């Protein structure tokens, strides 16, 4: 049984979230709190496994409360965010601090709209409960670096003569914002490839994520726009609610955004991106799958490997918030290197050499 504490300054939200969670057999709501100070007292008293935490509250806000929870109790926290600009920025900050994941409060007719997020809420709480306590950082001196050989053996470094063209694609979900913060800022600004990122996230939040990563990085980071050129030395974050692909035209690579649905139901979808990149037959590709629930990215990576000329990297279990997406690709035999999140940028950079010979 997963024991949950619900923290929100709205009595309506406390009741609705509690009711939704209580309907799930493996979840027990053991208490509620109206603000951060009350939450900290109840955590000590009730010993929950998972906490849902409103981002914007009086007395002690969600960000400050989250810091205390992680510092003192090291428990998984699901943030409950408004869709205001302030709410979005605070949510991205909370994910970077170490929140497990987040859901968005309803924006329209409150009772009807809230039911749309019930499935997401339950899924995230269950995943958080199964993940146990948040993992402490692992010493870099003791990290193993296992290698898993691909079942389909791709041609890794044989682009067409004289091209030297390369592209990097990354897929991630739960835990991704914090993981990306450990990868993107370490990439050099003169990286000789565009980087296209799929982070499972609702519409509106990816712009805040891109802005935050751009502020932290030497390499340029932006939310992708339909039809723009995919240029070397730039990171393109797929907008929430859209699928992203990359195509080749007479001038180079171009970003395409659309509303196509995928079997995984994710939008953006790593499978969708990877399949499009796999079609760039005269490009060297680096595909990275990082922390996240589910298996998005595995099917697309398999297609990329079949097309060839790919280096596939997965985040290690020890550094993942949720070892789902990388695990699926590893189990399928599609991964060449398994790397701790702290080492992924170096691995990408070594694959994407500044000069080709």
From Swiss-Prot:
Output the CDD domains linked to this UniProt entry.
CheB_Rec (cd16432), REC_CheB-like (cd17541)
Annotated catalytic residues = 173, 200, 296
Where on the tree of life does the source sit, at the highest rank?
Bacteria
Reply yes or no: does the keyword Cytoplasm apply. Answer: yes
Q: Which residues form the Response regulatory domain?
A: 3-120
List, in alphabetical order, the GO biological process terms annotated in this UniProt record: chemotaxis
Keyword list (alphabetical) reads: Chemotaxis, Cytoplasm, Hydrolase, Phosphoprotein
Q: What is its main location?
A: cytoplasm
Cellular component (GO) terms are: cytoplasm
Task: Cite the domain annotation text.
Answer: Contains a C-terminal catalytic domain, and an N-terminal region which modulates catalytic activity.
PANTHER family in the cross-refs: PROTEIN-GLUTAMATE METHYLESTERASE/PROTEIN-GLUTAMINE GLUTAMINASE, PROTEIN-GLUTAMATE METHYLESTERASE_PROTEIN-GLUTAMINE GLUTAMINASE 1
Query: What is the name listed in the Swiss-Prot or TrEMBL entry for this protein?
Result: Protein-glutamate methylesterase/protein-glutamine glutaminase
| Source organism per UniProt | Bacillus subtilis (strain 168)
Q: Which gene encodes it?
A: cheB
């Amino acid at each position: 049984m997963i024991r949950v504490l619900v923290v929100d300054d709205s009595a309506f939200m406390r009741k609705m979230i509690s009711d939704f969670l209580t309907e799930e057999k493996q979840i027990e709501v053991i208490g509620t709190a109206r603000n951060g100070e009350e939450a900290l007292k109840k955590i000590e008293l009730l010993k929950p496994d998972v906490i849902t935490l409103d981002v914007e509250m009086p007395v002690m806000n969600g960000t400050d409360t989250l810091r205390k929870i992680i510092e003192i109790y090291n428990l998984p926290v699901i943030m409950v965010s408004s869709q205001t600009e302030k709410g979005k920025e605070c949510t991205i900050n909370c994910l970077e601090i170490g929140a497990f994941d987040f859901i968005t409060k309803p924006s329209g007719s409150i009772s009807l709209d809230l039911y749309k997020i019930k499935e997401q809420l339950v899924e995230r709480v269950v995943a958080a409960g199964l993940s146990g306590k948040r993992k402490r950082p692992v010493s870099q001196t003791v990290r193993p670096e296992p290698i898993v050989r691909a079942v389909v053996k791709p041609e890794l470094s044989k682009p067409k003569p004289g091209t030297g063209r390369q592209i990097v694609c990354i897929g991630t979900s739960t835990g991704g914002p914090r993981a990306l913060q450990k990868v993107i800022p370490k990439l050099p600004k003169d990286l000789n490839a565009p980087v296209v990122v799929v982070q499972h996230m609702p519409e509106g939040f990816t712009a805040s994520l891109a802005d935050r990563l751009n502020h932290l990085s030497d390499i340029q980071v932006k939310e992708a726009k339909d039809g723009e050129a995919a240029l070397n030395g730039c990171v393109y974050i797929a907008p929430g609610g859209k699928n992203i692909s990359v195509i080749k035209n007479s001038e180079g690579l171009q970003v395409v955004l659309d509303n196509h649905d995928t079997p995984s139901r994710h939008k953006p979808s790593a499978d969708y991106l990877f399949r499009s990149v796999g079609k760039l037959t005269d490009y060297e590709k680096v595909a990275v799958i990082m922390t996240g629930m589910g298996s998005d990215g595995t099917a697309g990576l398999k297609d990329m490997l079949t097309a060839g000329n790919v280096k596939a990297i997965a985040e290690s279990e020890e550094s993942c918030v949720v070892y789902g997406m990388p695990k699926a690709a590893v189990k399928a035999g599609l991964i060449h290197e398994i790397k701790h999140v702290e080492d992924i940028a170096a691995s990408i950079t070594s694959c994407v050499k500044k000069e080709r010979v």
